[in-house]
Amino acid sequence: MAEKKILKKKVVKKSIAKGIVYISATFNNTMVTVTDEMGNAIAWSSAGALNFKGSKKSTPYAAQQAVEDALNKAKEHGIKEVGIKVQGPGSGRETAVKSIGAIEGIKVTFFKDITPLAHNGCRPPKRRRV
């Protein structure tokens, strides 16, 4: 029997100059996604993906590492300007935003907080009793 040749598609890296960094900072983790202006994901990272486990995922240091990892992946696509959209009340929120400004070769164009606020919609979960 003849061997079958398996053809693989070549991954072509797009050259994208502008993008948007979405930072989702929850109480347990920090997720970072870099997209183009249309919203197509280019690179992503999170504290959990960088092998921070348990309570270490929610630290500001883990958030900083996640941002640096995602932006280094995005730099390979040619990102030079980014806008920042932050969501959530997590502890790594401010550190993540500051670390974007510290990365060389990346210019921040805008900053927006997109945390959803309820206008007396659904009833919140019951209070925790410890």
Curated annotation (Swiss-Prot):
GO biological process entries: translation
Any idea which GO molecular function terms this record carries?
rRNA binding; structural constituent of ribosome
Keywords, alphabetical: Ribonucleoprotein, Ribosomal protein, RNA-binding, rRNA-binding
What GO cellular component entries does it have? ribonucleoprotein complex; ribosome
A Pfam match is: Ribosomal_S11
TM annotation in the entry: none
Which SUPFAM superfamilies does the entry mention? Translational machinery components
InterPro entries referenced in this protein's UniProt entry, alphabetically: Ribosomal_uS11, Ribosomal_uS11_bac-type, Ribosomal_uS11_sf
Quaternary state and partners of this protein? Part of the 30S ribosomal subunit. Interacts with proteins S7 and S18. Binds to IF-3.
What is the protein's known function? Located on the platform of the 30S subunit, it bridges several disparate RNA helices of the 16S rRNA. Forms part of the Shine-Dalgarno cleft in the 70S ribosome.
Q: Which family does it belong to?
A: Belongs to the universal ribosomal protein uS11 family.
Output this protein's name: Small ribosomal subunit protein uS11
Q: Which organism is it from?
A: Campylobacter hominis (strain ATCC BAA-381 / DSM 21671 / CCUG 45161 / LMG 19568 / NCTC 13146 / CH001A)
The taxonomic lineage of its organism, from the top, reads: Bacteria, Pseudomonadati, Campylobacterota, Epsilonproteobacteria, Campylobacterales
